């Protein structure tokens, strides 16, 4: 039995879905524990791409059960559409392999509208996906939220909707002056969706608890990345949930269950979508080359990702925030055959050199300390035995500065293009 957590160690888009899909081969459960359909995971199997936003990456494995934990904010429209799209591709999804927590907070049309009008009416853009994630978490924390189980009870749903709409109605009408669905329109839509999705509702807390007690393998699949964590991230340019390992305990299981591995998924370079500081960002042809070769376009938003060199002070910070046990390095192939290769090992900041970021640091004011690395060349024939010396040096540089080992290396989009240096399912 192993409890394994997959955490994004950067600003998201690190390739968590690929690693989760690979580990799902031996997993009994794959669990999403935070975020919502602002996540976008791409799986490539036999040359065919599958895009996931809510459903865990274990869905392509016939024996693996997929769980959406109570920490996820759930857009029932998006879930219904995703299930329909996957089923149309011949992917089996039923109440036998998909379990959605009855306690998930629901995203309504009001949340999505509020998200959109706020972003369009402010001069300080956050770069939100516009999916209603933040407003839904606001309602959850202020006790105005609607739970998944509320969709199945007409009276309860109507009363919860009235509570949720009360303040928003004034904002829509008087401040933003936009049209919005009436309570009855939203009620009719949500109740109908509830009847359709009710088959997937489950006590996921007990499902996970019983699986662990029975010695099953459980993989917890995070969304976004530690640097977008609402507490640890580059605030205010963050998401609205705990994307660090802390989200596992608040969004899926209990602290009484130990974690065997916390794997930080990390690109061999750095990317970011939307606004916010980015110390190693490249604005030249090298950045454009990485962007093009890496296919750096957001699955959820379709926005071009900003690209830069690997930032080890931020990676070390992420490792500390989530108590990472190892790193899964992805998209190494993107850096193959480059004329120039650099890595950031530290910052010059306020007259000092620092080698690990921290919550109070102003990343807009740091000067990255970049070191030249010897370029390397790899292709699909790379193995642990024939790995070029320059790549080994690149990996060792990361390990030495961050202080934890690299446990796997992904060198292409398909599930077969990955080297494992550690068996995550082998204890001790």
Curated annotation (Swiss-Prot):
It catalyses: IMP + L-aspartate + GTP = N(6)-(1,2-dicarboxyethyl)-AMP + GDP + phosphate + 2 H(+). It is an enzyme of class 6 (ligase). Mg(2+) binds at residues 13, 40. It comes from the Bacteria. Binds 1 Mg(2+) ion per subunit. GTP binds at residues 12-18, 40-42, 305, 331-333, 410-412. InterPro entries: Adenylosuccin_syn_GTP-bd, Adenylosuccin_syn_Lys_AS, Adenylosuccinate_synth_dom1, Adenylosuccinate_synth_dom2, Adenylosuccinate_synth_dom3, Adenylosuccinate_synthetase, P-loop_NTPase. The keyword Magnesium applies. One of its GO terms (molecular function) is GTP binding. It holds the Pfam family Adenylsucc_synt. One of its GO terms (biological process) is 'de novo' AMP biosynthetic process. Its cofactor is Mg(2+). IMP binds at residues 13-16, 38-41, 129, 143, 224, 239, 303. The active site is at 13 (proton acceptor), 41 (proton donor). Its EC number is 6.3.4.4. GO terms for cellular component: cytoplasm. Homodimer. Plays an important role in the de novo pathway of purine nucleotide biosynthesis. Catalyzes the first committed step in the biosynthesis of AMP from IMP. Belongs to the adenylosuccinate synthetase family. This is Adenylosuccinate synthetase. The lineage of its organism: Bacteria, Pseudomonadati, Pseudomonadota, Gammaproteobacteria, Thiotrichales.
């Amino acid at each position: 039995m192993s409890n394994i957590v997959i955490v994004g160690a950067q600003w998201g888009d690190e390739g968590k879905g690929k690693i989760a899909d690979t580990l799902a081969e031996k997993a009994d459960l794959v669990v999403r524990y935070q975020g919502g359909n602002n996540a976008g995971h791409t799986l490539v199997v036999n040359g065919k791409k599958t895009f996931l936003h809510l459903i865990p990456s274990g869905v392509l494995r016939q024996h693996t059960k997929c769980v959406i934990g109570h920490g996820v904010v759930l857009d029932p429209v998006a879930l219904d559409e995703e299930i329909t799209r996957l089923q149309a591709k011949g992917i089996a999804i039923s109440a036998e392999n998909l379990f959605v927590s009855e306690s998930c907070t629901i995203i309504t049309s009001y949340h999505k509208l509020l998200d959109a009008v706020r972003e369009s009416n402010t001069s300080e853009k956050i770069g939100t996906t516009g999916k209603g994630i933040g407003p839904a978490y606001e309602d959850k924390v202020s006790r105005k939220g609607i739970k998944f189980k509320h969709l199945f009870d007409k009276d309860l749903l109507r009363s919860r909707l009235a509570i949720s709409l009360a303040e928003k109605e004034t904002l829509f009408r008087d401040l933003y002056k936009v049209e919005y669905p009436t309570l009855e329109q939203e009620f009719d839509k949500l109740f109908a969706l509830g009847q359709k999705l009710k088959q997937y509702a489950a006590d996921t807390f007990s499902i996970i608890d019983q699986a662990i007690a029975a010695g099953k393998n459980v993989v917890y699949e995070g969304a976004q990345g530690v640097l977008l964590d609402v507490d640890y991230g580059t605030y205010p340019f963050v998401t609205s949930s705990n994307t660090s390992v802390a989200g596992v305990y608040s969004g899926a299981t209990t602290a009484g269950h130990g974690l065997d591995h916390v794997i930080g998924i990390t690109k061999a370079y750095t990317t970011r979508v939307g606004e916010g500081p980015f110390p190693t960002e490249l604005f030249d042809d090298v950045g454009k080359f990485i962007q093009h070769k890496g296919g750096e376009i957001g699955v959820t938003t379709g926005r071009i990702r900003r690209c830069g060199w690997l930032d080890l002070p931020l990676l070390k910070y992420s490792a500390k925030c989530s108590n990472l046990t190892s790193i899964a390095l992805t998209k190494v192939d993107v850096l193959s055959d480059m004329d120039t290769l650099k890595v950031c090992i530290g910052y010059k900041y306020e007259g000092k050199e620092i080698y690990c970021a921290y919550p109070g640091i102003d990343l807009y004011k740091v000067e990255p300390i970049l070191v030249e690395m010897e370029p390397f060349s790899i292709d699909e024939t790379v193995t642990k035995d024939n790995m070029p010396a320059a790549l080994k040096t690149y990996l060792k540089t990361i390990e030495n500065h961050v202080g934890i080992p690299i446990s796997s290396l992904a060198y292409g989009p398909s599930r077969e293009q990955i080297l494992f240096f550690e068996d995550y399912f082998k204890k001790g």
